[in-house]
Amino acid sequence: MRIDVISLFPEFITQCVGFGVIGRAQERGLLDLHNWNPRDYAQGNYRRVDDRPFGGGPGMVMLIEPLRACLEAVRAADPQPAPLIYLSPQGVLLNQSRARKLAMLPRMILLCGRYEGIDERFITHEVNMELSIGDYVLSGGELGAAVVVDAVIRLQEGVLNDAESAKQDSFEAVDSLLDYPHYTHPSNHAFGNVPEVLRSGNHVAITRWRRQQSLLRTWLRRPDLIDEARLSKADRLLLDEIKRTHPMDTDQKASVSWRGV
């Protein structure tokens, strides 16, 4: 998959995605990543990329022309059509379902804003989607772009050594439940012992335990996902059993995610 990133700080993106799974994806040719700096397409001795906003107010706004020229160069580098996705807190929220849809694209262009944002006229005429990674504000779109790259590329065939890893991740199943707990050696530790069922060798019991734990975690931490999930009759029976053995009111449920913070 080819991903082009337009950013005033291209080194930021390179550093963020140059390690681990995504770094190996680049080495294997599964991710073709290209960084573009609008400043390289700005005019004048100072290569200015921003100016004061009309109407006054704090901060600066990114100029249309450097962005337009940069985007033209991006499109000229590869004739394959690609949506321009602007990382913005005003965009639609990135979730696993949307990541799967983006992963089906052969190519996409990510646009990172800075300062107070980008001239609205450029957004109106060129941007195909505004995408947010959460209801908070960052200094720029680079972190968001790195998140999108990671979320999308790990879904590409051959990126993960074990394809089942992606299928078992939180939000990845058809019902979008949270993942079950994972344990490794040693089996006994001062922090606690590995549940006996996982050491039993009984794969039917292990599968049931993992499903039950997935339901429990989702019910405690993200009850909204339980409401949206397409649970089977067996799942609902498991969930009813969980609710009987883990009675918690709303305040207690909320405290689970915070762990006392």
UniProtKB/Swiss-Prot annotation:
Catalytic activity, EC: 2.1.1.228
Transmembrane segments: none
The UniProt record lists the keyword tRNA processing: yes
GO biological process: tRNA N1-guanine methylation
Origin: domain of life: Bacteria
Matching Pfam families: tRNA_m1G_MT (PF01746)
Catalyzed reactions per annotation: guanosine(37) in tRNA + S-adenosyl-L-methionine = N(1)-methylguanosine(37) in tRNA + S-adenosyl-L-homocysteine + H(+)
Gene Ontology molecular function: tRNA (guanine(37)-N1)-methyltransferase activity
Keywords: Cytoplasm, Methyltransferase, S-adenosyl-L-methionine, Transferase, tRNA processing
Subcellular location: Cytoplasm
Any one of the GO CC terms: cytosol
Enzyme category, top tier: transferase
Record flagged with keyword Lipid biosynthesis: no
Function: Specifically methylates guanosine-37 in various tRNAs.
Complex formation: Homodimer.
Annotated family: Belongs to the RNA methyltransferase TrmD family.
Record-linked PANTHER family: TRNA (GUANINE-N(1)-)-METHYLTRANSFERASE (PTHR46417:SF1)
Name the record gives this protein: tRNA (guanine-N(1)-)-methyltransferase
The organism of origin for this protein: Xylella fastidiosa (strain 9a5c)
Gene giving rise to this polypeptide: trmD
